[in-house]
């Protein structure tokens, strides 16, 4: 049996109940227009539906929400390996006012289970990326590198106003990253454009420092998307769009030796890739025990390359 779950001029999504359903990656692709869910098409009539019964089909979902308004598109997300429903889906109303009707109804039950509809793209103000700054994040320093080594190297590019390394209070050893502040943002631009620099025989990564209010939502969504990837069988760019609705996962998804560390960044800054910068990374010396090794097969995610200090465990040593 073939059930058509879309109407109107938009693309039609079709699920087959007696044969393997549409691959989860393809279903997800129809719902993801950007890599982080904050740009691209944000249909005001679109809703995320969580808490679905494993037996709920796209047709059942469409029939239920059809009482609130004409449904333009509807889908239930499935695991591409097992073909089982993953307990959540999406609907898009023709008239965005139908979303308010759904939200005004406090309780929703479908197939004997309470479900949780939410606005797929909630309105929120996001801090803008800082592109002009004199402060640069330096990551991947060798254990033998000193504050003086870092300062001397970057002084070859311009005057250094401030330099600091972040130290572990318990071991009194630096954690492999720090910050350099130049006397002009032009020098910082040049350093970040080169991106990788060699200090004491080890490649280090330079990124423009960003206010933590910029990095916090990015990091949270990236971390949750990375954790959920295997469970939901979706590519990261899709999960990022809906990461705020997915279950929270335990464990530390950032760099080794770092925990919840958004609270005490010096000056409220962290590192973030420069927009439009090259993503080509040269052969480097980041092994699995290094600062840049992640627990997801060694894949380096740009936003997870940001360093934050734990309020109780880390402090800085400054040259000035």
Swiss-Prot record:
What is the top-level taxon of the source organism?
Eukaryota
Q: Can you give the residue ranges of the RRM domain?
A: 45-124, 134-211
Residues the record lists as Phosphothreonine modifications: 18
- Composition bias, kind Low complexity: at what positions? 1-14
- Chain positions with Phosphoserine modification: 19, 34
Instruction: Give me the Gene Ontology terms describing cellular component.
Output: cytoplasm; perikaryon
Tissue specificity is:
Expressed in the gut and in AVA, AFD, RMD, RMED, RMEV, RMER and RMEL neurons (at protein level). In the tail expressed in neurons and all the ray sensilla. Expressed in male specific C1-C4 neurons.
Annotated keywords: Cytoplasm, Phosphoprotein, Repeat, RNA-binding
Q: Name one GO molecular function term.
A: mRNA binding
The cellular location(s) given in this protein's UniProt record come to: Cytoplasm; Perikaryon
One GO process term, biological-process aspect: regulation of translation
Chain spans, region Required for binding to target mRNAs: 88-93, 177-182
Which residue ranges does the record annotate as region Disordered?
A: 1-48
Gene knockout outcome: RNAi-mediated knockdown increases short term memory retention in response to repeated exposure to diacetyl, a chemical repellent.
Q: Where is the composition biased (Basic and acidic residues)?
A: 23-38
Matches recorded under InterPro entries: MSI_RRM2, Nucleotide-bd_a/b_plait_sf, RBD_domain_sf, RRM_dom
Q: Which family does it belong to?
A: Belongs to the Musashi family.
Q: What does this protein do?
A: RNA binding protein that regulates the expression of target mRNAs at the translation level. Binds RNA containing the 5'-[GA]U(1-3)AGU-3' motif located in the 3' UTR of the target mRNA. Binds to the mRNA of three Arp2/3 complex components arx-1, arx-2 and arx-3 and negatively regulates their translation during association learning. Plays a role in time-dependent memory loss and the retention of conditioned behavior over time, probably through negative regulation of the Arp2/3 actin cytoskeleton branching complex and regulation of synapse size.
What name does this protein carry?
RNA-binding protein Musashi homolog 1
What is the organism of origin for this protein? Caenorhabditis elegans
